[in-house]
Amino acid sequence: MPNVLEDLASGIVVTEFDGDTGIATVVNVSGWLFENLGQVNNYLYTNFEGEGASGTYGEMDIEAQSVLKELYLANYYNKEARNALRGITTSTASGDNVLSLRDGESAVTFVNRNEVSKVYRGLATDCMNRVTQLAAQYNIYQAQPRQLGGIDASGIGVTYT
């Protein structure tokens, strides 16, 4: 049985982080995806479980995978927003946060951590809006008719007298 979550995690690392394992590793991403399958189940009214992400109707389809991917990205951006406010986002040396220098009248401009955090929060909000949109589309297009009547019901082999 293929490991859907590991394949999805590999895709996230390659496409979203350009394969930079310093940002996220496949193991970390697939672990997060596995631990948060319940969120997808809540949004999509499904029951995916296990490493193969299988449920009542089989393996997790591509639409459900895209919802899980957006949930991961929203979580990642929220975490980065918190880290930016703490001032620890990829800041290894003093001076990493210098934005510009001017020699005339000696001006130094630093990165505004609050603005960086707002950008990350905006990205997280965009991802959650996308999750809501994708979940609604998934639930609409995966819905089965509850009742057949009229012309649709003719020819199904049932005769009412």
Role assignments for model-derived ranges:
Residues 27-130, 137:
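Divalent metal-cofactor coordination and adjacent catalytic microenvironments
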Residues 1-61, 133-161:
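Conserved short "hinge" loops at termini or chain/domain junctions
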